[in-house]
């Protein structure tokens, strides 16, 4: 009876060691198939077979030792390219097709990345996508800034693109220098319109305040300047300006932009 038990225990011990060796080998094999790339400061972990999917490309050359590539301080391959755009390059290698998020507007930059990594298929798909976008008529975005604060009607900002209105709101909170925890509802009319009604005159110029407690938000000139600069940064161009001969664009009674 004791002999049978001892024999069984030895069999279990052998099986345990055997399984342990298998797990170790599998772990080593798994690690050997993975590769970490540092692309412009962004780390990407992927399988070698993904990077070698297309022969005679930059990434395939690195994996197979055809191309010498420097290492970063942690021993990862370092590629001095756009780290954010590389995710689209990697997704192309994984999926075999170009899949981009809605509203993607960096086709030319992505085309340059495709050329660098020698991915002809990706370059062709980016080019095709860009050509289709050029043929598709774009909806005109309209922005109007009207200043009637002298007539107690305040400053009104209208834009048919709600995302621009959201950017203006965020900017106003920022320039208020911590006076606001968030954008006040009293200024919001809709997703397309902001109406700043409450201004008081002071030695430093006309000041935008909150209705409830007269908390100072920013000056009228700052408000208009930030809206104008935001418009220009977002690609709007000035169409008309009604300024009553006051000179600076900031003092205009009405500004109309299109994009």
Swiss-Prot record:
It comes from the Eukaryota. SUPFAM superfamilies: POZ domain (SSF54695). Gene3D superfamilies: Potassium Channel Kv1.1, Chain A (3.30.710.10). Residues 33-134 form the BTB domain. One of its GO terms (molecular function) is identical protein binding. SMART domains: BTB. Residues 1-25 are annotated as: Disordered. This is BTB/POZ domain-containing protein KCTD4. It comes from Homo sapiens (Human). The lineage of its organism: Eukaryota, Metazoa, Chordata, Craniata, Vertebrata. The gene is KCTD4.
